[in-house]
C-alpha cells in the first residue's frame, strides 16, 4: 500500500451505525438512509440517485456477495457494499482516502489500495489480497478508454458467480461527456454477457447533484454468463 500522506478530512465522522439489526427486513433502507445524511451529501460523499441506491441495496441483500471490490471510492457507497458483503472488502482509488474511509469502516476487515487502477502494480496488489470477487464496482476513470481498461483487467478477478457493476450508465445522463464521462457509451457498446440496467427517471430528490435530482447516475450490472 502506498505510504503517501493521508487526505485532509474536511467533515465530522458519521456516528456509528446501530439503528437496525442486519436481520431486520428494513436493514438495506436503514443503511442507505445512513449513507444519505445531509452533511455527507453536501460534502460529495454520496453522488447516487437515492432511489437507485435504495434499489441496489435490496438487490445486494438478495445477491449476498462474499468478496467485494470498488474501483473509485468516496466512502458512503463502499460502506453500503461492505455492510451487505460477508467476505473481503477492498477499494482502489488514485486519491489517498484511507483516513476518510476509516471513519466508515472502523472495526471492519477491509483493505484500501492507493494507486492507479490501470497500473499492473495495483492490480497485482489487489489480486494478492483476493483473486475472486463476487462484486466489482467500476466507478473510477470515467473516460471511455479508462472504463474499458478497468473492465478488461478486473473481469479476470471475478468469482464463478461474480458480476461487475458500472455507475453513470444512464443513456440520458445530464452530465455525460462532462463529469459523467463516457461510461454510458461503454455500457451501450458492451455486447457480451448479460446486462441489467437500473435507472431512475423521476426521483424524490432526496439526493441532488449540482441541482439535479435524477438522470445523474444509472447503474448497470454485467454478468459474463
What feature does the model see in each segment?
Residues 1-137, 141-225:
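A short alpha-helical cap/connector motif
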